[in-house]
Amino acid sequence: MSKTQINLQDAFLNQLRKENIPVTIFLVNGFQLKGAVRGFDNFTVILESDGKQLMVYKHAISTVSPSRPVNTSATPEHRNVGQ
C-alpha cells in the first residue's frame, strides 16, 4: 500500500466533485440537502444547490448518498483503499 494514498472519504468526495454527480446529504438532525459537491476540506463540504453554495460542516453529516455508483479506484493510489 502506498504511503501517499488518499483516504476513502476524500477519494469518494473527490469523485463526486470531479464527475459532478448529484448527491443527497442527510444531516444528523434529519434534514436533507440535494446538490453537487463543489469542494471539501477536513471539516466542511461545499454543496451547490439551486444556484446557491452551502457550506456544510462534516460533523453535521450522517450520510452522503450519490445518485449513481462512485468509482473510488479510478487512479492507482486509490486501488487499495478500504482493503
Swiss-Prot record:
UniProt-listed PROSITE patterns: SM
SUPFAM superfamilies, alphabetized: Sm-like ribonucleoproteins (SSF50182)
| Domain Sm stretches | 10-70
- UniProt KW RNA-binding keyword: yes
* Keyword line: RNA-binding, Stress response
List, alphabetically, the InterPro entries matched: Hfq, LSM_dom_sf, Sm
User: Biological process GO terms, please?
Assistant: regulation of DNA-templated transcription; regulation of RNA stability; regulation of translation, ncRNA-mediated
**CDD domains tied to this protein:** Hfq
Q: Does the keyword RNA-binding apply?
A: yes
Molecular function (GO) terms listed? RNA binding
Q: How does it assemble?
A: Homohexamer.
| Family to which the UniProt record says this protein belongs | Belongs to the Hfq family.
What function does the entry list? RNA chaperone that binds small regulatory RNA (sRNAs) and mRNAs to facilitate mRNA translational regulation in response to envelope stress, environmental stress and changes in metabolite concentrations. Also binds with high specificity to tRNAs.
UniProt protein name: RNA-binding protein Hfq
Write down the species.
Answer: Desulforudis audaxviator (strain MP104C)
The organism that produces this protein has a lineage beginning with:
Bacteria, Bacillati, Bacillota, Clostridia, Thermoanaerobacterales
